[in-house]
Structure formats: structure tokens, C-alpha cells
Amino acid sequence: MAKPSTPSRRVVLPRSLNNSTVNPPASAAALQGALLAFSHAVPPKPQSPMMADRPPVSLLDSDPDPPSELPEPGSIKGKIALFSANSTATAPSDRPRSAHESVPEIARQKSPQLLAAEIATGSVQGPGGKTTSDDVQRTRLQRNGAVPSRDLSSPIPVRKPVINPRLLDPYQDETPEHSPPKPGSDQRPVSSKSSASPRPPIRKPRPVPPPIPRKPSPALSEPASKSASHRFENGLRRDEARKPPLPLRSKASAATLSEERPPTLPPRRAATAHDLYINQSTPGRAESPAGLSSSPSVVSLYSPAHNASRTSVHTVASRDAPSDAVAASSTASNRALQARKSPPPPPPQRRRRSRSRSLLHVQHKKDRTPNPSPGGLRETLRPQARSDDEDEQRRRQHKSHIINKHPHKHNEGERRRWRSEITEKERKRYEGVWAANKGLLIHPSQVLDENLEPDKIPPGMYPPAALDMVVNLVVRDIWSRSRLPNHVLEQIWNLVDGQKIGLLTRAEFVVGMWLIDQQLRGHKLPAVVSESVWASVTRVPGISLEPYNTKH
């Protein structure tokens, strides 16, 4: 039968000792020293079945401000040696234990280094199932022979340890009660070895955490994009930059994640008509998952899964963003120009004819006489200009004078003077105007009979040849189109009107038209029209009107 535990073994600390807590920096220093000693001495143990379901805990999930100073290794080793010696002296291995002080198999396998780490951080669980520093101090006082003042019904709560005790020992068993550890026969060499010269460090391989389940893509999940945009609006980007990086994953998991996740793109600006056109013209980019929307790139940059590689992505994206934009714009413009400037399809080629038919066609072409190509404008019914034309001669003489002689010298012999006759060309032109206007505004009843004598013509009647004459009203209308003053036109009328009856014959009308042209060319009007001018109008070319007997 197991002996009940004597009350002298449980030492209750006074209130002053319970209230005095260990400073957080000292406890953190003791924790780091214990961890260092544990990593040097304890080999890796197989994971217990009770801890198989517990997820791996990262060391960086605790307080983000651990102390930077490490304790001296001598003090930690001394504490561990003292603890092992006291436990050996006070707790013999053959002492029977009570039922409530029985320790499970996992607690028996704990080494002195693990127990030292638990004592340093105050992680030994009390009788109530909670770890308190009172139990640790009670154990120390019992071993040192201190007498407790009085028992307390319940321990006074002290300040919580700085670091989670689960971080110290992943194999710690959560049992409702723990009795003081029973040192075995294998503890003495371990303690002696720990106090002796240090062994070469044996690093415990970290357990490989299971691969983090891949979250749904932010481009395809709407809630993720909404939460990311909300965090981006609240300014969580600066908070994430201040936090320490997440624990590094193993190489295998990092390789799988890098293969599965495509590289993220930088945040794009607001979509415009030009961007929509580029996306439509480049189907390769439109089908990519990053091109589904403008927000996924922002969400992927600020999601927790990408915090570790966020800075490198920013630097690479900032460098590649201008080049990608330039390349996209150039390709889009080139494709647009090619689509616009693509030439129409060539016309279908003619089928090649047989050789015999082509030879016959060539012979037929040779037999035909080529049509004379027109050298210039097509000829009309008008006759060509004669060599005696006044304008043609004047132009030729003027050109020759400019080339051969000095332009400021005058040749009196070739000077154009007043002509005493009307050319045939001018006469024909004036006679055409007369023929178109003769007999206008003359009533046939006003024309006298040819049998009447000129002395018996009543007033208001016209001579018998009045139908071949032009009335003064018609003459004034035609001559006024020359834009000469009225007094000049009156002078010309007086020079050519010989009948004084308000009518002009053919010769009078032609001479009057000729005088108007001379006035327009800058010549002065003569006092009397010369006979040569009248003769050039009345003479028919090729026929002499003179009587035959005058020549003899």
C-alpha cells in the first residue's frame, strides 16, 4: 500500500514570498538558457500519441519582444546541477508514492534539462491543473529545509509567464496533477555531463509542419477580395510592415507553393477605354488569372500568405511595370495598324490560255494597223488660224524682241500704229453680231414699198431695206456692254451714222464696232473715218465691185 504523503513535504510560502514575483526579463533569460541546454543535451524523442493531434506551434506566435541579452551559461548549469542533487537526496527511488502523486509514463521520461526549463519559467502545474510559481518555490523551500509559516487555502495568483509554456516542451503532457519528479538512476551521469565540459552541439531537427492549406484564389473568391480591400482601406499595410516576418516554411512546402502560385502583378490603375481595347486585342493576357480584374493583384500583395515575399515582389513589379506597359501598348498599336492597313486580297489570277490561241492572238495584233494616236486636242470644224493673223504676228514679234534685243529700246519701224483698214477676221466677227440683231423692233408695216421714191417717204416710215438694218435702241444696248462712257459712244455714233434716220446699215455697224475695239486698245478716235476703212468693209474678198469700164 502506498504511504500517504506527509504534510511536511508540502511547503507553503508566506504572503510576502508569494507576492514577490520574478521579473519578466530574468525569467525570459532563464527560459533561453534552459532551451539552450535542452537543445545541447536532449536527443529527439518520438512524438507521443497524446500530442499527435496537437498542431505545431511556432516560436514567433508569442510575445514579439523577447529580451536580447542571454544569461551566462555557468549560472544555468549550476542551477541544473543543484536541482538534480537535491532531487536525488530528498527523493529516493525506492520510496512508495501515493495514488494522487503518481506520474504518467511521459513525465517519467523527462530529463533534468526539461524539468529545469519548466522550473525556470514556472510551468510546473499545480494540484489544480494550472501552472503556478508557488509550487516551484514550495519545492525549493522543502529541499532547503525551510519551515512554512501557515497553509493557505488557495495560492495567490501571480503574473502570467511571459512566454507560453507550450513553446518550451512540445511533448509536455497535460495531466491534472504532477508530483515532484522522481530522479532515476540515469540522472546522475546526465547531470555530471551537463556540469562538465560541454558536448558538441546536437541540434534537434524541427518537426516539419504540415503544408498550409491553400486558400481560394482572391480573383475567384469575392469575400476574400472584399476583406482585403477593407484592410487596405484601414491602413493595415503599415501595421503588417512593422510586424516581424512569419516563420519560415520548409523548402519542400515553399517549393510546392512557389510552383502552385503564379507571381503576383503590381496594382493596376483604373481601367480605361484604352485598357479595355488592349485587353480585347491581346487575348493571351485577357485569359490569364491576373487579368480577370484589377483588384486581385492588390489583394494578393496584401494577403497574409504573401507577406514573406512582398518586398521582393514590389521591387520586381516596380521595375517591370513600365516595360510591360510599353510592350503592351506597342503590340496593341502594331496590331491595330496591321488590322487597319491590311491590303485588300489580290484579284484572282487569270487562267493561262493555250499556246496556240495566244499565238493566233499575237498574229492578229500584228496584222492590224495601229490607230494614229491624237497628238493634241481634237480638231473641230473651225479653220486653222491663218499666217496673216494680227495677234499671232504680234506675239511672235514680241517674243523675238525680248530675247534678241534690249527690253528698254524701242523700234520705231515695228511700232504698232493706227491701221487704215479692217482685217478679214475682225470683219467676220462684227458681221456676225450684225446678222444676229438686224431687223429687230421694226414692224413690217413700217417698211415702205420699194416702188416709192425716197422724196415721198412719210414721217415715221422706214426705207424698204430697213429689215437689213439695226435700230438705234438695239445698237445702244450692244455698244453699252463695252463699258465705255456715253459721250464716247455718242461720238462713235456720229462718225458712222450717214442716213440720220436712226438706223445703221451693215457697213456702218461694222465700222462702229471696230472703232470701239480701237478705243479699248488705247487708240484715239479719228476725226473722220478714212476711205480705206470703208473700202475694207464693203469689198468682198476675191471679187472687185468696180465697174469693168473704169479699168480701161
Swiss-Prot record:
Question: What are the record keywords, sorted?
Answer: Lipid metabolism
Q: Where is the composition biased (Low complexity)?
A: 188-197, 288-305
Sequence ranges of Pro residues compositional bias: 207-216
User: Could you tell me which Pfam families the record lists for this protein?
Assistant: EH
Q: Does the keyword Mitochondrion apply?
A: no
Biased composition regions of type Basic and acidic residues, renumbered to the chain: 94-103, 230-243, 410-419
* Polar residues biased stretches: 306-315
- A single BP term in Gene Ontology: lipid metabolic process
Compositional bias of kind Basic residues: 349-367, 395-409
UniProt function note: Positive regulator of phosphatidylinositol 4,5-bisphosphate turnover and negatively regulates signaling through the cell integrity pathway. Involved in rDNA silencing.
The family note in this entry says: Belongs to the IRS4 family.
Know the name of this protein? Increased rDNA silencing protein 4
User: What is the species of this protein?
Assistant: Emericella nidulans (strain FGSC A4 / ATCC 38163 / CBS 112.46 / NRRL 194 / M139) (Aspergillus nidulans)
The coding gene here is irs4
